[in-house]
């Protein structure tokens, strides 16, 4: 027998072990059935899963369970990502904190061993959290992005792209993190708006490329980065700026270093910003770099890779080749100074040289490294790049032609905007952790690319006596992630898995990585994976983009804000003190602690109650609206915990009232079926139609809402309450019909709800199997999914029952208001009845009497005054009347009327007294006087109605 109280934590672990042990998550290999595959975006091994992971994994699991139950061969590939830079930083910090050692002190070999140890621990934590969430992935094919098979696939792809001249090495401007000493992606750069300074500096004009003009002739340059002036190679003005047109083609002198540079024109210059004159420093500003490309300017690097002033400048042309147009070196006094210290000294020298005109406060967007917190430096470095323009065309066409569909469709615009302005992708990183690039050099720096050194020697015919050394850079994590759709399916070795499940059906992702992951997967997959006609195969047919889960105030979650929601806290619950300690511990800035504590105390004064996995999953489904940002709401979680309780209690009632073996699939053949039985079956099939349509259209929020509305309002609060009212007084045939209907609906609801709330549905379904004829599949997840049957949806029954339901609710509320037992018989009448409702009442009079505990139901044909009745209600097609009786006698009602009339008269007297006060009328605002007059009129009208009712009752 089902336990009295719903206790999700008691059953979740054992149920998941039951599923996994029996291999229910594996493809079922149903011959002749279509395949359905999802490859999970691999979580980073940097720490615990957060609510965003739980949200997306719930969505994916709903899709997998739904498609499994409709008979498809489902495969859900799972794995974790090595997350190069993120993992390296986490482990570095851990070692520094625990052992006070740097990576340099530890050594490369030992450090990598520590990361692999971290990986094993972190992966176990992550996969255990996934299991807690109930996700039905095939664990027998779990992957890691640095697994040997994946690494082989990555090397093979790199070699292929290099041999096709799509990968090349070149010196270009990149986002350089001086603390991490590596190039980072745009995704890892965060701009912070700050109030900084704008320095206005004199650049003297020169004549004949060498002679300084008198000090009256100069241009004023406004800059926010005076420390970069050692790298200036031009001054730019707008071609249509009348102030500076005459200087275009002239030359100017860079302060302190005395380099002579040209004055050029470029439409990029904003005439309204600063002075309209811009110093061009191509090696340390991305906009300046683009201007240098257009005007063939020299590019001068003045910073080292740790953000200090170099002792010897590095000069290059626009192709990245070394150049030596300018001879000036950085003055000795600036060598090896940190860039921000150099800034202060340069400003002091400019003041001493009387070259600094003014300093002005200015709003700036400063680029910071998301992981290191350091100011990012645009830096000219040698990196490896992938040419993406040839790949982008076919990827754009795949979406335009409908081979790949974005859901919601609005995200196609974001995809196109990036793809149509795409630039070559920097794929190298200066890290220790990651896929080491399959590149080798000889002593002459000749480049060789292959699967490994042995393969390279064979490929390029290099003898063993020639020394080769491997490139130290690793690949950008996004490179291996972009191959995940096919590499995780065993490509190029595991032919069966790849053959059966590629292309995958849908990828679930956030809008913030459309550029960095989705687009790149499409490009590389379609370039590398071809059909028998040589056409590119899409990696997935649909892209479902979820919103970003934010905190209760709509703010993005981050550890520094102390607002990250741990899904396990929602499942298991956590005390207020433990929650505060947990979130404070994870914050980066201790100055925020007091504010964070106050917020936590306000949001969770009693901590967080245990709600179980199903409540969390239901919340995730219900929150999945097609919006960009989604507010987390703890009250929704508690509401869906109550839903699970409701379903549990309803199931318990049904199971307690079953004594005969029934077979749900034959339910509709059992006669007689009562009106309410036929109504609930019809309502259920309407639910099936709406629910499946919602799932098929990726509207999990709608699916959750219609399921909730049916189970709570129609099945539990109405149908089951009806059954309770007559189950002990009906005939055996009626009882059998009702029991079968209860089982049919419960069994069907459990199967319908299973993709969203798998644990409670499996637990109840297993208990229900004691009373029904079993099939050979011992789990609900392999049962067939309910199908819409139009033959079971009778429109007349739905309309009739909705009308009767309304009458039932009115009478139930009436009983509750007057504290009358639901078993006490009362009488009702109807007047002003339409022909349709007249027919309905006559046809179902006995049924109405039975379910509402009525002594008599009559139809009044004469035009009697409603005032003669105790209560009257206007309903569709009639007026419902409840006559006086021994339960509510006329004398008692007259007494109540007199009390009400006296009460209203007192209110009228008070208002009339106030409105007759001339002093009040003279001083009070017009709208206040008007408000009192309106109140008086309402009271007078109400009193008139009550007096009319009293007189009518006295005359009768």
Curated annotation (Swiss-Prot):
One Gene Ontology molecular-function label: aminoacyl-tRNA deacylase activity
Amino-acid positions noted as binding ATP in the UniProt annotation, renumbered to this chain: 559
GO CC aspect terms: cytosol
EC number: 6.1.1.9
Catalytic activity: tRNA(Val) + L-valine + ATP = L-valyl-tRNA(Val) + AMP + diphosphate
Keyword ATP-binding: yes
Motif 'KMSKS' region: chain residues: 556-560
Gene Ontology BP term (one): valyl-tRNA aminoacylation
Biological function: Catalyzes the attachment of valine to tRNA(Val). As ValRS can inadvertently accommodate and process structurally similar amino acids such as threonine, to avoid such errors, it has a 'posttransfer' editing activity that hydrolyzes mischarged Thr-tRNA(Val) in a tRNA-dependent manner.
The family this protein is said to belong to: Belongs to the class-I aminoacyl-tRNA synthetase family. ValS type 1 subfamily.
Record text on subunit structure and interactions: Monomer.
Protein name per UniProt: Valine--tRNA ligase
Species of the source: Buchnera aphidicola subsp. Baizongia pistaciae (strain Bp)
């Amino acid at each position: 027998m089902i336990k009295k109280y719903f206790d999700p934590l008691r059953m979740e672990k054992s149920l998941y072990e039951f599923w996994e042990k029996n291999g229910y998550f594996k493809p079922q290999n149903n011959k002749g059935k279509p395949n359905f595959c999802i490859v999970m975006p691999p979580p980073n091994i940097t720490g615990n899963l957060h609510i965003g992971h739980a949200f997306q994994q719930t969505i994916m699991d709903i899709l997998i369970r739904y498609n499994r139950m409709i008979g498809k061969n489902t495969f859900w590939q799972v794995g974790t990502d090595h997350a190069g830079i993120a993992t390296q930083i986490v482990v570095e910090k851990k070692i520094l904190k625990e052992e006070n050692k740097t990576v340099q002190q530890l050594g490369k070999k030992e450090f990598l061993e520590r990361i692999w140890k971290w990986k094993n621990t972190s992966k176990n934590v992550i996969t255990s959290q996934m299991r807690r969430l109930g996700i039905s992935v095939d664990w027998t094919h779990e992957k890691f992005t640095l697994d040997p098979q994946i690494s082989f696939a990555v090397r093979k792809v790199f070699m292929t792209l290099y041999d096709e001249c799509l990968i090349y090495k070149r010196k270009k401007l990149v986002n350089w993190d001086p603390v991490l000493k590596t190039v980072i992606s745009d995704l890892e750069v965060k701009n912070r708006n700050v109030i900084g300074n704008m320095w206005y500096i004199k650049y003297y004009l020169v004549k004949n490329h060498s002679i300084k003009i008198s000090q009256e002739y100069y241009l004023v340059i406004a800059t926010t980065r005076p420390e970069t002036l050692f790298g200036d190679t031009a001054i730019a003005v707008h071609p249509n700026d009348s102030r500076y047109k005459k200087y275009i083609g002239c030359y100017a002198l860079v302060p302190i270093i005395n380099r002579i540079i040209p004055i050029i024109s470029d439409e990029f210059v904003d005439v309204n910003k600063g002075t309209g004159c811009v110093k061009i420093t191509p090696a340390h500003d991305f906009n300046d770099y683009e201007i240098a490309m257009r005007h063939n300017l020299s590019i001068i690097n003045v910073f080292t890779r740790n953000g200090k002033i170099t002792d010897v400048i590095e000069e290059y042309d626009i192709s990245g080749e070394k150049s030596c147009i300018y001879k000036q070196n950085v003055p000795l006094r600036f060598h090896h100074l940190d860039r921000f210290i150099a800034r202060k000294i340069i400003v002091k020298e400019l003041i001493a040289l009387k070259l600094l005109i003014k300093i002005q406060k200015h709003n700036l967007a400063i680029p910071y490294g998301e992981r290191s917190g350091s100011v990012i430096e645009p830096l000219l470095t040698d990196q490896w790049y992938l040419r993406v323009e040839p790949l982008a065309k076919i990827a754009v066409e795949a979406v335009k032609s409908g081979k790949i569909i974005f859901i919601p469709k609005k995200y196609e615009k974001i995809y196109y905007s990036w793809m149509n302005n795409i630039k070559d992708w920097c794929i190298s990183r200066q890290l220790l952790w990651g896929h080491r690039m399959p590149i080798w050099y000889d002593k002459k720096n000749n480049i060789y690319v292959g699967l490994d050194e042995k393969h390279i020697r064979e490929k390029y015919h290099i003898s063993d006596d020639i020394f080769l050394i491997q490139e130290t850079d690793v690949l950008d994590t996004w490179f291996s992630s972009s191959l995940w759709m096919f590499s995780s399916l065993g490509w190029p070795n595991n032919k069966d898995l790849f053959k059966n499940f590629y292309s995958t059906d849908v990828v679930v992702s956030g809008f913030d990585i459309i550029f960095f992951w989705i687009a790149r997967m499409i490009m590389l997959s379609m370039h590398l994976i071809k059909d028998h006609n040589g056409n590119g195969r899409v990696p997935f047919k649909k892209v479902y983009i979820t919103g970003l889960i934010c905190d209760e105030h709509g703010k993005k979650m981050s550890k520094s804000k102390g607002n990250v929601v741990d899904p396990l806290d929602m499942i298991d619950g956590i005390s207020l003190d433990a929650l505060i300690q947990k979130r404070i511990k994870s914050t980066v800035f201790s100055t925020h602690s007091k504010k964070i504590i106050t917020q936590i105390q306000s949001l969770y004064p009693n901590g967080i109650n245990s709600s179980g996995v199903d409540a969390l999953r239901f919340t995730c489904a219900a929150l999945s609206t097609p919006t960009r940002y989604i507010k987390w709401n703890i009250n929704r979680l508690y509401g869906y915990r109550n839903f699970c309780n409701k379903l549990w209690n309803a199931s318990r009632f049904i199971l307690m009232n079953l004594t005969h073996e029934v077979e749900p699939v034959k339910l509709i053949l059992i006669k007689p079926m009562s009106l309410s039985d036929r109504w609930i079956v019809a309502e259920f099939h309407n639910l099936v139609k709406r629910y499946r349509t919602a799932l098929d259209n990726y509207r999990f929020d709608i699916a959750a809402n219609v399921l909730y509305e049916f189970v709570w309002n129609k099945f539990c609060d109405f149908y089951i309450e009806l059954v309770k009212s007559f189950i002990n007084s009906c005939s055996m045939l009626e009882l059998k019909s009702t029991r079968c209907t209860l089982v049919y609906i419960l069994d069907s609801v459990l199967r319908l709800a299973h993709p969203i709330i798998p644990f409670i549905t499996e637990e109840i379904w297993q208990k229900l199997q004691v009373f029904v004829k079993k099939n050979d599949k011992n789990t609900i997840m392999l049962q067939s999914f309910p199908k819409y049957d139009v033959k079971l949806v009778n429109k007349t029954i739905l309309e009739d029952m909705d009308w009767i339901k309304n009458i039932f609710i009115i009478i139930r509320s009436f009983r509750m208001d007057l504290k009358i037992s639901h078993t006490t018989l009362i009488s009702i009448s109807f007047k002003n009845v339409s022909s349709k409702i007249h027919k309905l009442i006559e046809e179902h009079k006995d049924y109405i009497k039975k379910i509402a505990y009525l002594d008599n139901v009559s139809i009044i044909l004469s035009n009697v005054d409603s005032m003669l009745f105790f209560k009257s209600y206007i309903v569709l097609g009639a007026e419902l009347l409840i006559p006086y009786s021994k339960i509510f006698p006329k004398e008692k009602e007259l007494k109540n009327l007199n009390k009400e009339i006296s009460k209203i008269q007192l209110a009228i007297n008070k208002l009339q007294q106030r409105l007759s006060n001339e002093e009040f009328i003279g001083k009070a605002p017009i709208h206040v006087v008007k408000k009192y007059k309106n109140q008086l009129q309402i009271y007078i009208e109400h009193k008139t109605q009550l007096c009319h009712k009293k007189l009518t009752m006295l005359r009768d």
